[in-house]
């Protein structure tokens, strides 16, 4: 019986960087979006 884990050892684990161009683009859009949604939601509770 052969060892079934030996072919799996040839796969190397790739570590990706956290801060990429995609990360910057997503957060450049997501952070102001969440801020404005929170501001609009807060405006709903303002009574004159």
Curated annotation (Swiss-Prot):
- TM spans, by residue? 23-39
Cofactor(s) for this UniProt protein: heme b
Q: What is its main location?
A: membrane
Record-level GO BP terms: photosynthetic electron transport chain
Which keywords does the record carry?
Electron transport, Heme, Iron, Membrane, Metal-binding, Photosynthesis, Photosystem II, Thylakoid, Transmembrane, Transmembrane helix, Transport
Q: Name one GO molecular function term.
A: iron ion binding
One Pfam annotation, family name?
Answer: Cytochrom_B559
Q: How is the cofactor bound?
A: With its partner (PsbE) binds heme. PSII binds additional chlorophylls, carotenoids and specific lipids.
Question: Where do the annotations place heme binding?
Answer: 27
Its annotated function is as follows:
This b-type cytochrome is tightly associated with the reaction center of photosystem II (PSII). PSII is a light-driven water:plastoquinone oxidoreductase that uses light energy to abstract electrons from H(2)O, generating O(2) and a proton gradient subsequently used for ATP formation. It consists of a core antenna complex that captures photons, and an electron transfer chain that converts photonic excitation into a charge separation.
Q: What is this protein called in UniProt? A: Cytochrome b559 subunit beta
Q: Which organism is it from?
A: Prochlorococcus marinus (strain MIT 9211)
């Amino acid at each position: 019986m052969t060892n079934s884990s030996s072919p799996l050892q040839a796969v190397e684990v790739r570590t990706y960087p956290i801060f990429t161009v995609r990360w910057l683009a997503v957060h450049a859009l997501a952070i102001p979006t969440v801020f404005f949604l929170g501001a609009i939601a807060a405006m709903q509770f303002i009574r004159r």
